[in-house]
Structures are given as structure tokens and as C-alpha cells.
Amino acid sequence: VIAGLRRIPLKRFEDERGWFMELMRSSELPKPVKQSNLVYSRRGVIRALHYHERGQDDLFACVHGMARVVVLDRETGETFSEDIGEDNPVAIYIPGTNAHGYEALTDCLFLYHVTEEYDADDPDEHGIPWDDPRVVDLWSTRSPILSERDQAAS
């Protein structure tokens, strides 16, 4: 088990109007959330592996569709992966300097809360190749759609 990593089950309440889901409570997290980001990804996209030297924590949730979360403990080499989203409503809390990312298993809306605000003048953004031998077998695709940044990490 990766130290500090948490699975947080999400409850979805539905009625004739639609549904409601609570995504996070600050009181239940080790650090306060300072920024939230919403990303739309097409099926086959991998956004990974990213890490933050200064220890930013991330809380991942897939709010529409399905995504595979992958986490790598850079010190021990231990890995974690889980498919989250509509079929498995779970948030994943990723502490500190662990490398992390996700694969869009379907077109998806992916929400992540972070414990540091992004600073374009001093970004704490670092990468490990998505196909690093420690995690390559955790992805469902061998030919992902990648950003230029994620391609450069390879």
C-alpha cells in the first residue's frame, strides 16, 4: 500500500430530477484544497505520469465516464491502479511526491482538487514516461493519445 493514499467512496443520490454527489469534505483531508480543475479527455488519452517535488497532494474523481488512475511511489516503486467513475464512484487521494496520472477508458470528465495553486512562473510540474517499466502494464492501451509534455517525458 502506498503510504497516505486513500480511496474515498462517493455516494450518488438519484431522483426524478437527476442526481447529486458529494465529492470532498475539507475536514476529511490531510491538507486544505487550494485549487480545483476539471478536464475533458477523449477515450485513449493518458495524462501521466506527473509529480510535484514540493509535495502537492491531489484528489482525483471521474464525474462522467470511466478513467484508470495510476500511482507510482517514486521511492519504493510500489504501484496502485483503479478504474473510477460512473461504474465505480470513488475518489483517490494521492499524497506528496508520488507520480500519478490517468487514462480515459471512455470519453470522460475528470475533476482534481489540489493542495497548491498552480504558478505559471514557478511550476512544480515534473514527469515520468507513461510507459515506464514500473507502470506500463497497468494501462489498457499501448498507443495512447499524449500531450507534447507527456511525449517529451518518454
Where are these regions (language model features)?
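Non-catalytic, conserved peripheral segments adjacent to functional cores
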Residues: 1-90, 109-154
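Conserved SET/PR-domain catalytic core that frames the SAM/AdoMet-binding pocket
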Residues: 87-106
